[in-house]
A protein has these predicted regions:
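Aromatic- and charge-enriched surface segment that lines or borders ligand/interaction sites
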Residues: 101-146, 161, 295
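N-terminal lobe/hinge region of extracytoplasmic solute-binding protein
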Residues: 54-107, 201-202
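Detector for C-terminal structural segments
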Residues: 2-3, 8-21, 26, 309-335, ...
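Alpha-helical secondary-structure segments
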Residues: 52, 129-136, 163-169, 204-205, ...
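Surface-exposed binding/hinge segments that line
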Residues: 111, 115, 148-190
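Gly/Pro-rich hinge or "lid" segments in bacterial periplasmic/extracellular proteins
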Residues: 173, 181-229, 233, 243
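Ligand-site clamp/hinge motif
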Residues: 222-267, 394
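Local pocket/hinge segments that shape ligand/substrate recognition
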Residues: 257-347, 372, 376, 439-448, ...
Length: 520
């Protein structure tokens, strides 16, 4: 898998955010506990204690560079606690302030001014300046995935206006530009040398105490500009498998098993000393149907496949009930997501008729390419193949090695599975995977009306008018795109009974532990 693909996944939910999803025979989900670690209203948050967190990763893929490719969730967690980004996912909005306290666009939505938070300092006491931010963003832009991390913003278009004001000038009008600052916009001190990056002081709520082989201890930053941090320390332990991580939590060796998955959640359901935290809309697992050419280019064929799938059965069996059905639109975590577009249901008779009208060759067997890059992906392909056979479509599931899949299949094959974090915006997915000029147009889709709606959305500042345009964009995607989004997987954490106020946002939002505390 290439660097760009990994970084885009982290933009939403991180690598392996589906955890240990697997087909189970049990029903539609365990005890919902999205407020699990919040504590009761009568409890007062306490200071102190060390939170021990398990996170997925491989020792061979460890990175210490905040602007590198974080293939390990453990690395991203550590980096996110030490180094703040300019913005973060919000509870009610796509973007909330962090190291940047505010931002304001020009009238044409091309020039944006970001203000560095008052009182923000590096861990060595040095004030954070606009020059530090500019240097860091230019370093980020120079990475192999830089164009995807800061699309439309060239290095020369990143400048400091004064000590606390950073100016970003986009090549085009972009009402969603602040979204870009939620990703890996970690800020380092200007001119930090590459051989000092691993131990460079950050600006986050925790300071690095030690790091060994992917494991780390972080201690509270008492001078954090973002407010009082409750925990004394966070210890992060790296685990190569969700099951090993779950076992460590059940044995009391760690307090939190992050992104542990549905199988472990089922195991923990009977434990009164363990809480299951569900983060809705954490991972989308669509089937991609190539629209540019091949057997699925006819929109009637794509519609037939969408009508042939049993979405509720997919969620129940593939996700063990820890998820929700999809409606073939990416960006389900966006407040602008069009929930009023009619939900597709299963209609085998209509599917067969559409296939006949399109002259689809039902005598042929078609390959559906997948990989076990995340657990549950291959299982979803197998169940999908079984379901669409009832409409007369014969599918042969081909499991590929992840490297082969991402190098030879992704963006090219007529029919394959993929996965994305879904707490990103509708416009994010449009820009990355669906507009005609996208370099990662997974289905090879070209639809002038969609492109026009996308450009209009980027250039519209008025909230009411923008909402109308975004709705139109989603209607087109729902009707014509190459995606069959049958469901979204919940992110699942396991937490010991004393843990309080774990974040419930999907994707990057779940690594914000500055308000977490321990009732012990």
């Amino acid at each position: 898998m290439g660097v760009t693909r990994r970084q885009l996944l982290w933009a939403g939910a991180g690598i392996g955010a589906a955890g240990a999803l697997a087909a189970c025979s049990s029903g539609a989900g365990g005890p919902e506990d999205t407020a699990a670690a919040a504590g009761s209203a009568s409890e007062q948050p306490r200071s102190g204690g060390t939170l021990k967190v398990g996170a997925l990763g491989k020792a061979s893929a460890v990175t210490r560079d905040p602007h590198g490719s974080q293939a390990n969730e453990s690395d991203y967690l550590i980096l996110s606690l030490v180094h703040d980004t300019l913005a973060v996912p919000g509870d009610t909005t796509n973007t909330a302030p962090r190291l940047a306290s505010s931002w304001k666009p020009s009238e044409d939505l091309r020039t944006w001014r970001f203000t560095v938070a008052e009182g923000a300092r590096f861990h060595d006491g040095t004030p954070v300046t606009a020059e530090d931010v500019v240097w860091s963003l230019k370093r980020l832009r120079a990475t192999p995935a830089g164009a995807s991390r800061l699309p439309g913003i060239k290095a020369g278009s990143i400048t400091a206006e004064d000590a606390r004001t950073v100016v970003l000038v986009s090549d085009y009008a972009n009402a969603d530009l602040p979204l870009l600052t939620r990703l890996t916009t970690f800020v380092l001190k200007k001119d930090t040398k590459d051989d000092q990056i691993a131990t460079a002081p950050g600006t986050g709520p925790f300071k690095l105490d030690w790091f060994r082989d992917g494991n780390a201890r972080l201690v509270r930053n008492d001078d954090w500009y973002g407010g009082k941090v409750l925990l004394d320390a966070v210890e992060v332990s790296i685990f190569e498998s969700p099951q090993a991580m779950a076992n460590a939590l059940l044995a009391g060796q760690i307090d939190v098993a992050s992104n542990v998955g549905a199988v472990a959640a089922r195991t923990a359901e009977s434990r009164k000393d363990v809480r299951i935290l569900r983060r809705p809309n954490d991972m989308a697992m669509p089937v991609v149907m190539r629209t540019a050419d091949g057997p699925f280019a006819d929109p009637r064929v794509r519609e037939a496949l969408r009508l042939a799938v049993d979405r509720e059965a997919m969620v129940k069996q593939v996700l063990s009930g820890y998820g929700t059905i999809g409606n073939d639109i990416l960006g389900t975590g966006d407040p602008a997501f069009a929930k009023d577009i009619p939900q597709r249901g299963r209609d085998l008779a209509r599917a067969r008729q559409l296939l006949a009208d399109a002259g689809f060759d039902t005598a042929r067997t078609y390959d559906l390419l997948t990989t076990e890059d995340i657990s549950g992906l291959a299982e979803s392909a197998t169940l999908f193949a079984t379901q669409v056979r009832e409409a007369g479509v014969k599918i042969n599931v081909v499991k590929q090695d992840p490297k082969v899949f991402w190098d030879a299949t992704w963006l090219k094959a007529p029919l394959y599975t993929t996965y994305w974090g879904t707490n990103d915006s509708v416009v994010f997915f449009a820009s990355k995977t669906m507009v005609s000029e996208s370099g990662q147009n997974e289905a090879g889709w070209r639809e002038p009306a969609f492109d026009e709606a996308y450009r209009k959305a980027l250039g519209t500042a008025d909230a009411t008018e923008r909402a109308k345009v975004l709705h139109q964009l989603q209607e087109i995607e729902h009707a014509k795109s190459g995606y069959l989004l049958w469901g979204m997987a919940d992110g699942i954490d396991l937490a010991g009974a004393p843990v309080r106020n774990l974040p419930t946002l999907p994707g990057y939002g779940r690594v914000q532990l500055d308000k977490t505390w321990l009732a012990r």
